[in-house]
C-alpha cells in the first residue's frame, strides 16, 4: 500500500473521528473524593508540626480550613473569617470582628470563641506550632459579643499578616475538644 499525503490526512481524520465516538465507561463509581497530591499529608491540623509551614501543603489546608484573613492575588488582605481587625490607639490590644453566618463541617456555628481559642492554643509551646513565637505575642484572648480582644504581650506590627499566611487557620473548638489532637491525625 502506497500512502500519499492526502490519503494520510484522510486516514488521520478518520482515526480521530472513530476515537471520539462515545464508548461505555468502565470506571467504577466510588463514595469518596480521591485527590492525588505530590506530598504526603502527615496531619490534618494545619497549625502544628513541620507540615504547617510546608508551602506545598498549604493548598490542601486551604481547601479544608478557612483562614482568619484572606489574601488577594495582589497580596493585599481581605475579609475572611474576620471581617474587621485592628489595633487599639495605644497598640496594647488588638481587636477582631468575627464573620456571622458561618458553620463548621458538622453544622455547628462558627463563633468568636473559636477564634479566641485557636489563637490562644497555637500560642502555647506545647502545641508544637512551628511559629508559636508569632502567636505568643498576643495574650489574654477574650470574647466580647462577636469581637475577640487580645492583649499585646510583645508588639509585632505584622501580626495580622500572619493571619493570612502559614498556620493562620481557625479550628473548631468544640469539635477539637471532642476528638482531641488524635482526631486530626
Regions found by a protein language model. Give the residues of each.
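C-terminal segment of N-terminal export signals and the immediately downstream linker at the start
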Residues: 22-40
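N-terminal lobe/hinge region of extracytoplasmic solute-binding protein
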Residues: 36-89, 120
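Surface-exposed binding/hinge segments that line
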Residues: 132-185
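Aromatic- and charge-enriched surface segment that lines or borders ligand/interaction sites
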Residues: 84-128, 144, 149
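N-terminal secretory signal peptides and thylakoid transit peptides that target proteins
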Residues: 1-15
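Extracytoplasmic/secreted proteins, especially bacterial periplasmic and envelope-associated proteins
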Residues: 63, 80, 110, 114-117, ...
Amino acid at each position: 500500500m502506497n500512502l500519499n499525503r492526502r490519503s494520510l490526512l484522510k486516514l488521520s481524520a478518520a482515526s480521530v473521528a472513530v476515537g471520539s465516538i462515545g464508548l461505555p465507561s468502565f470506571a467504577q463509581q466510588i463514595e469518596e473524593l480521591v485527590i492525588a497530591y505530590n506530598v504526603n499529608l502527615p496531619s490534618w491540623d494545619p497549625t502544628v508540626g513541620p507540615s504547617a509551614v510546608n508551602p506545598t501543603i498549604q493548598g490542601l489546608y486551604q481547601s479544608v480550613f478557612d483562614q482568619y484573613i484572606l489574601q488577594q492575588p495582589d497580596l493585599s488582605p481581605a475579609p475572611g473569617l474576620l471581617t474587621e481587625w485592628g489595633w487599639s490607639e495605644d497598640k496594647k490590644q488588638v481587636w477582631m470582628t468575627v464573620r456571622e453566618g458561618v458553620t463548621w463541617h458538622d453544622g455547628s456555628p462558627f463563633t468568636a470563641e473559636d477564634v479566641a481559642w485557636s489563637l490562644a492554643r497555637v500560642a502555647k509551646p506545647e502545641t508544637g506550632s512551628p511559629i508559636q513565637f508569632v502567636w505568643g505575642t498576643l495574650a489574654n484572648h477574650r470574647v466580647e459579643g462577636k469581637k475577640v480582644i487580645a492583649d499585646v504581650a510583645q508588639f509585632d506590627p505584622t501580626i495580622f499578616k500572619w493571619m493570612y499566611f502559614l498556620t493562620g487557620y481557625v479550628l473548631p473548638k468544640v469539635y477539637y475538644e471532642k476528638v482531641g489532637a488524635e482526631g486530626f491525625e
